[in-house]
Amino acid sequence: MRGELPNKHHSYTFFVFLFFFLILFPDLSISVNTLSATESLTISSNKTIVSPGGVFELGFFRILGDSWYLGIWYKKISQRTYVWVANRDTPLSNPIGILKISNANLVILDNSDTHVWSTNLTGAVRSSVVAELLDNGNFVLRGSKINESDEFLWQSFDFPTDTLLPQMKLGRDHKRGLNRFVTSWKSSFDPSSGSFMFKLETLGLPEFFGFTSFLEVYRSGPWDGLRFSGILEMQQWDDIIYNFTENREEVAYTFRVTDHNSYSRLTINTVGRLEGFMWEPTQQEWNMFWFMPKDTCDLYGICGPYAYCDMSTSPTCNCIKGFQPLSPQDWASGDVTGRCRRKTQLTCGEDRFFRLMNMKIPATTAAIVDKRIGLKECEEKCKTHCNCTAYANSDIRNGGSGCIIWIGEFRDIRNYAADGQDLFVRLAAAEFGERRTIRGKIIGLIIGISLMLVLSFIIYCFWKKKQKRARATAAPIGYRDRIQELIITNGVVMSSGRRLLGEEEDLELPLTEFETVVMATENFSDSNILGRGGFGIVYKGRLLDGQEIAVKRLSEMSSQGTNEFKNEVRLIARLQHINLVRLLSCCIYADEKILIYEYLENGSLDSHLFETTQSSNKLNWQTRFSIINGIARGLLYLHQDSRFKIIHRDLKASNVLLDKNMTPKISDFGMARIFERDETEANTRKVVGTYGYMSPEYAMEGIFSVKSDVFSFGVLVLEIVSGKRNRGFHNSGQDNNLLGYTWENWKEGKGLEIVDSIIVDSSSSMSLFQPHEVLRCIQIGLLCVQERAEDRPKMSSVVLMLGSEKGEIPQPKRPGYCVGRSSLDTADSSSSTKRDSESLTVNQITVSVINAR
C-alpha cells in the first residue's frame, strides 16, 4: 500500500493542474468536429466546430456592423477566407444567436427564438442525427450511428455561396432536383447574394454562363471531351484534376488537387469575375492562377451574330468569310452593333461549308445535338436542313465524334492562335468561286452594263451639281438658320436626359463658308491630311490671313458623325481652358459637316510616345511631367471648374494634342456627356470608348462617372512614363498588360523598371530625370487605375498630389483589368479581405452594346 501512495498523489496533482489549465486557457481546449442534438453553438460562447484535421472551421462571424452570419473558413490560414455562409440573406441583427439541431434539422434561431435559417428537411424524421464538419469543408447532417456516417441527410456542398471547393459539384442533380451554382457577394463587406451568378445551362450542349440580372456576361463554352472549349488553359493545370459528368442522374463539374496538403478554390467576385486561387504557404498568400473573363473577346456576344472576335487583330471583331458588315462605315469606326449579313443568299441543296479553325464554338442553347453520329453524317444532316447555318463535333477526342448543328443565327465565337475547335459555316457556292453557266454569265453581263450606264449618268449629274455649288460666292440663304436648327433646337442632352439649351439660346461661334474651307485645304488635298479618326478626316489648312487651322471633315455617311458634330459644337464652343483644344468655327454645306480648330504644331501625344522617330527625343522627363500636369488640370476643369460638369469618356494619347511649346490640350469631345452638379454616375446601353483606357465598371456594366475619366487618366500617366501602350503591351515571359506589369514591379519595389529608356538616357543633354517625381507619378497613376471606382481619387486630389512634393500619397490597390498570373496582396487575399480590391458593386442594368475603338 505504501508503494501506491506516491502514484495516487501524482494523479491528483495532474488532474488539478489540468483543471486549472483549462479554466485559464479555455481557447486551448480540445475542439470538436460534430454537433449533437443535445448541443448548440452560440455567438456569445465564441466556440466553433473544427474539422478532424483542423483544415476548416465553422462558427458565427461578422465583418462590419451588427450583422452576424454562420460560415465556414480555413482554420490554418492566417488570412480569414470565407468559403460558405449559411444565412447570407437573413443575417442575425444582434450578437444573440444559436445553431442547434431541432426535429432532425439544423436551425439558426435569433434572440426571440425565430427561425432565421434552416436545412428544411421534410419527410420521415430520424430519432437521432448529428452535424459534422469534414476536412473537405463540407458541413453535413447525418444519422448518429456509425453505419450511417456515409449517408448524408443534408450537406452544405449542395448549397454553395460564392466559392467552389475541391470535390464540390457545380451543376444539376436530376435525381434530387438540385441546381448548384455560385453567386457573388453583394459587396466586399456584405455576404448577401450579389448581382452575378455562374451557373450551368443544359439546353443544347451543357455549358456554364456568367450572368448578371439573367443577362449573359461570359460563357465557358461546352465540354468538348477534354475541357470547356472557351477555357483552353484547363489542360495546363498540372496541379488540378477536373471532371465533367453528364448522365441521366446529373450534369456536373468538379475538381480536386493532386497535392492533398494544398488548398485551392474557385470564387466569383463582386464584379462577376470567376477567379481560381491556390494557397502559397511560403508566401502566405493566395495566388490567382486563372480568371474569366480575361479579355474583351470573353464578353458574351461582343461582336454580334456571324462575326468572331480575335484579340490579335484590329479591330478585334471580324465578319466571317461570306459575310459583310451591314454598315461598313459604322464597322470601320468601331461600331459593331450593325451586325454582319450574308454577301450571297443561300440556295438549299447547292450550298457548301467553310471551315473555321481554332475557334471557340458558338453558344449551343438553341443548337441540336446528336452524339451518335460523326462529322460526315453531321455535314449531311446540316446540308439537308435548309435552316442549318453551321455544324461541329461535340467531342474532339480521338479525331472527333458527335454532332452539333446550329439553326438560324449563331453568336459568341472567337479565334485562338492554336488548340481551338473546327467550326463549319454554311455559305453560298458562289463564295467558293464556283463557275457560272453561260446563260448566267450573259445575264450578269447585261445587268452589269446596265448598272454601269445608270451609275455613270448619276455620277455625271452629281458632278455637275457640285461644280455649280463650288462656283457660288456666298453661303446659301438661311445658312446660319440651318446650323441653329441642327444644333440649338436639339439642345445639349445631359446624362439624365434633360435638355440643357433651348431654342432661345444662340451659339457664339463664328461660321465659315465652305468655299473658304476648300481654299484653305487645297480642296481637301491628301497631302494636307493630319490624321484619320473614327468619324472623319482631319486636314491642315491655311486661311487667307495666314492663320493655320485644323479642319475636321466628318464622314457624310456616318450618323454617329452627325451626333459627334452636334455634341462637340455644343460643348467645346462653351469651354475655355489652356489645356483644352479651342474650336474656332464650324461649317455646314449640303451634306458636309466641318469643325475648324486651332492648329497645334506638334500633333498628337501618341505620335511622340509610341512612334520611334526623332520627335520622341522631345519628351524628356520635364516635358512629360508638364504634360501630365496639363492633362490633369484640363480634366479638373471639365469635372469641377467649368460651367458644366463634363465626362469626356474617350481620354487617350491620340486625343491629347501638343502646341509648339508642348502644352497639352484635350480634344475630341464627340463622346462627352454632361452631368448635373449633384449627379455622381450614370449608365448607358451603348458603351463607347477605346479598349485599354475604359474603366472596368464602364466596359462591363456601362456605368460611367468622373472616376471613368480618372481611370483613363491613370492609364495615360503610365503610358507617358513608360512610353508603351497599355493595349497590346506584352512583357517577355509574362501575360500582363501595362497596368499589370507596372503593378507587379511596384509591389516588388522596382517601379523605375517601367520608365522609358529615353528619359533616363544619361547621354542626352535634354534629359532632366527626377526619380522621385517619376515614382510619384507612377504611384498616382496606379491610384487612378484601381479596380474599384470608389477607391480612385478625384482629379482635384490628383492635381494636389502632382504639385506636392512632401505630401503623403496613399498606397494603391490592385488595378482593374490586371491581366496575367499574379499573386494578390496580403490585404486582398481572402473572400472577405480580397474583396477590398475589387470593383464597386454595380446596379442591375442592361448593357446591350460595347462600342469601343
Curated annotation (Swiss-Prot):
Positions of post-translational Phosphothreonine modification: T684
Residues modified to Phosphoserine: S558, S654, S667, S831
UniProt: ATP binding residues: L530, G531, R532, G533, G534, F535, G536, I537, V538, K552
Effect on the protein of changing S45N: In strain: cv. Ge-1
Chain segments annotated as transmembrane: 442-462
Domain Protein kinase residues, every copy: 524-802
Pfam families: B_lectin, DUF3403, DUF3660, PAN_2, PK_Tyr_Ser-Thr, S_locus_glycop
Span list, region CaM-binding: 613-631
Cleavable signal peptide: 1-31
Major localization class: membrane
Compartment annotation: Cell membrane
All copies of domain Bulb-type lectin, residue ranges: 34-154
Membrane topology summary: Single-pass type I membrane protein
Region (Disordered): 807-838
PAN domain boundaries: 348-428
MF term (GO), any: protein serine/threonine kinase activity
Glycosylation sites: N46, N120, N147, N243, N387
Enzyme class: transferase
Residue stretches of biased makeup (Low complexity): 822-832
Disulfide bonds: C297-C309, C303-C317, C378-C403, C382-C388
Domain EGF-like: from-to ranges: 293-329
Function, as annotated: Female specificity determinant of self-incompatibility.
Name under which the protein is recorded: G-type lectin S-receptor-like serine/threonine-protein kinase SRK
Organism this protein belongs to: Arabidopsis thaliana (Mouse-ear cress)
